Amino acid sequence: MWCTAGGGEEETKDMKIVHISDIHAAEPHFLPDLAEKVIEKINEIEPEIVVVTGDLTESGYAFEFERAKGYIERIECGVKVVIPGNHDARNVGYLAFEEIFGPRSKVERYGGITIVGIDSTQPDLDDGHVGREKYEWIEKCLKTSDFKVVALHHHLIPVPKTGRERNIPMDAGDVLELLIRCETDLVLCGHKHVPWIWNLNGMIIVNAGTACTNRTKWNISQSFNLIEIDEPEKEKGTIRIYRMYPRGGEELVLEKRRVKK
């Protein structure tokens, strides 16, 4: 649960999470020079955690995964959570993903933060689906007093400026109810290449744009997200979300104070 941040609070150490998405490491849309700038900028930030919310590839081929892996490995960060997107599930790409990046759904815990990565893809389909068979596992992972982060490729709420909307998970309503019931603090998504933020019943939902491709919507630049969390192990703290532009510049898009129920 969050409320608007006030002034005059004592400065505390931040935990930094970088959220990138939709790399699509294959021609003709991938921009290698921009990918270099993304890596350079992330390494300057020195985040504790990096989350990649899918679409590492264009068509799910092994050489695309290897190329994406090469870039991700150059990010200087001890904790990396990588999950697949719908493009990664094409051409049995989910098998290559598992071999290179491990399980498609996973949980990581670090410094008072629990991150639950969920595979929302289906083979050779753009539509998303989490699946009831995962609900019990998700709920178990979120039974913690940590700052709770859930990451999945498909956004759970439609995103403006994306045209006809048909790509939220088929069970988005059930997943939203589950995450809110589990008092999830933050949800990270990608998919439509348009950055956006929703605040739903105190749960912040952050959509990332594409980090380093030319597959951008009109008048929207490539970007990734930086999330700063003051002392996640404490009952109160401030979250700040910045939109980072690899071509230069940044923008503070959200500042909220966390208040545990």
Explain the meaning of each model-derived region.
Residues 62-144, 174-180, 226:
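Extended active-site neighborhood of metal-dependent phosphoesterases/phosphodiesterases
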Residues 26-29, 58-63, 86-93, 123-126, ...:
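Active-site environment of divalent metal-dependent phosphoester hydrolases
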Residues 19-21, 50-55, 80-86, 119, ...:
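Active-site neighborhood of phospho(di)ester-bond hydrolases with catalytic His/Asp-centered motifs
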Residues 12-18, 107-117, 143-147, 199-205:
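Beta-strand-turn-beta hairpins that frame and shape the catalytic cleft
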Residues 164-235:
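Conserved beta-sheet core of the metallophosphoesterase superfamily
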Residues 2-71, 140-144:
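N-terminal active-site segment of His-dependent metallophosphoesterases
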Residues 230-261:
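A short C-terminal boundary segment appended to hydrolase-like catalytic domains
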Residues 144-161:
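Short acidic, glycine-rich surface-loop motifs adjacent to enzyme active sites
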